[in-house]
Amino acid sequence: MPYIITQSCCNDGSCVFACPVNCIHPTPDEPGFATSEMLYIDPVACVDCGACVSACPVGAIASDTRLAPKQLPFIEINASYYPARPIDLKLPPTSKLAPVIPAAQVHVRRRPLTVAIVGSGPAAMYAADELLTQPGVWVNVFEKLPTPYGLVRAGLAPDHQNTKKVTELFDRVAEHRRFRFFLNVEIGRHLSHDELLAHHHAVLYAVGAPDDRRLNIDGMGIPGTGTATELVAWINAHPDFAYLPVDLSHERVVVIGNGNVALDVARLLTADPDNLARTDISEFALHVLGGSAVREVVVAARRGPAHSAFTLPELIGLKATSEVVLDAGDRKLVEGDFATVSDSLTRKKLEVLSSLVDSSKPTSRRRIRLAYQLTPKRVLGNQRATGVEFSVTGTEESRRFDAGLVLTSVGYRGKRIRDLPFDEEAAVIPNDGGRVVDPSRGRPMPGAYVAGWIKRGPTGFIGTNKLCSVQTVQAVVADFNAGWLTDPVAEPAELAKLVHARQPDTVDSVGWRAIDAAEIAQGSTEGRPRRKFTDVADMLAVAAGAPPLRLRALS
């Protein structure tokens, strides 16, 4: 009865260190960890202890006897990561454990290490967690929205509630007595980098990649065009996108790009609104989706099936919940790739693609069509989008799709931060292992650090940020221990005074807990995990009704 890792795996790696027989791979010290689509349990080596189940922050692990029907393909996926062995073979238990990355040890100085973290998504919260393992370290997290947790709150599809459970880990971090939230505070607007550094030994930026990579073709930008990430933010009640004018009065939507976000959008646009009503989806978005006329979403990729950007777990999940089809031409492309590709993961994707329904078969369900070798040329329409024209990649042929909504899903892009260097081409802050590097001098900027997507680019999954943040924290601690970080010039109590003077509507940890509790209470009456606020004013009103946070002295 081995345990199985399923679709919602976040690559956090906590399960690896909980396993007493080192049967979960790749481990964080192995080369494939940073790029692996998920982690895998060796069914032959697993001793059925279940330690990994409680360690997983997103509930992605279950016994093979307790899997839902849609999770059964993950039995083979886990097993196929390992060499083929006789079915009755059982490896003897081993005492070898995955090597744990030791926490950086902070040396005692006159002033305890105090770090400002800008951003509150996974990279930020993993960094805070790592810092707070050391006695005496203080962490202040600054976030421009009144609510924390970045893309976990506003970028994960609402029907992926298991994955959103990682916020329970972040909540525990935020409850630490040496942790403070300064929410609804924008660095670069309310406070500068230098002002943060005057109150902290170090400033760690974990702001993600908030912009979209843009597709520069004629017609993008007219009504009826947008980006998949904007649509996901709209669906998730992000206050900046809560009332996006999304027109779903036409029968077809085209999504350009075929990564996981593209699949999320396609799945949500074709989902039964009654099912979405049991999630934390935005009320406004749910109303619009309830009146949708969309019958088909075309997910168009420039390259062939073997180069599909989506992950295998997401493809399997999509097939289990949605009507996914291929036309005859794309099916031939799948067959051609399968004959030439040797990589086992890619071959598994191609196997799943080859099993999809033929698009010529009639269906009463809304459907998702995966299309390949289509290079976008222009959006059709004058006053608003009426379709999109593609060239068939590598040929002189053109292909058109009528569509009332055209979305691009070609990736995220980091954004310049005032007072810090920025690599425009890579869209990251130049750094060496997390230390921000001034390109003009070729040396690190004292006290400035980065983690997450703004450090390495928009790659990996939620848990990938954990190892990335640990590396940066080790750099912070090493520099502090070496005496390279200047003690704050301001007294600790002055920080809160300065923040509230600049932004009277600052939301602290107590205010966030009040917002969180109110959303959960509103949702519980409707059988939902929460009903999110969409207006900042409503969030601030709830937070203002919370008792003030009693500040603790640094010690």
From Swiss-Prot:
What Pfam families is this protein classified in?
A: Fer4, Pyr_redox_2
Catalytic activity annotation: 2 reduced [2Fe-2S]-[ferredoxin] + NADP(+) + H(+) = 2 oxidized [2Fe-2S]-[ferredoxin] + NADPH
Residues given in the record as [4Fe-4S] cluster 1 binding sites: C9, C15, C19
Question: Binding residues for NADP(+), per the UniProt record?
Answer: R213, N258, G259, N260, V261, R302, R303, E314, G460
Q: Which cofactor does it need?
A: [4Fe-4S] cluster; FAD
Task: Name the keywords, alphabetized.
Answer: 4Fe-4S, Electron transport, FAD, Flavoprotein, Iron, Iron-sulfur, Metal-binding, NADP, Oxidoreductase, Repeat, Transport
- Which intervals hold domain 4Fe-4S ferredoxin-type? 2-29, 37-66
The gene that this protein is the product of is fprB
Q: Please list the residues that bind [4Fe-4S] cluster 2.
A: C46, C49, C52, C56
Among PROSITE patterns, the record links this protein to: 4FE4S_FER_1, 4FE4S_FER_2
Membership in a protein family: In the C-terminal section; belongs to the ferredoxin--NADP reductase family.
Query: Which InterPro entries does the UniProt record give?
Result: 4Fe4S_Fe-S-bd (IPR017896), 4Fe4S_Fe_S_CS (IPR017900), FAD/NAD-bd_sf (IPR036188), FAD/NAD-binding_dom (IPR023753), Ferredox_Rdtase (IPR055275)
Could you identify this protein by its name?
A: Probable ferredoxin/ferredoxin--NADP reductase
Q: What is its EC number?
A: 1.18.1.2
Keyword Metal-binding among record annotations: yes
Could you say which residues bind FAD here? A123, E143, L151, I187, W453, G460, F461, I462
What SUPFAM superfamilies does the entry give? 4Fe-4S ferredoxins, Nucleotide-binding domain
The note on the cofactor says: Binds 1 or 2 [4Fe-4S] clusters.
Q: Where is this region: Ferredoxin--NADP reductase?
A: 115-555
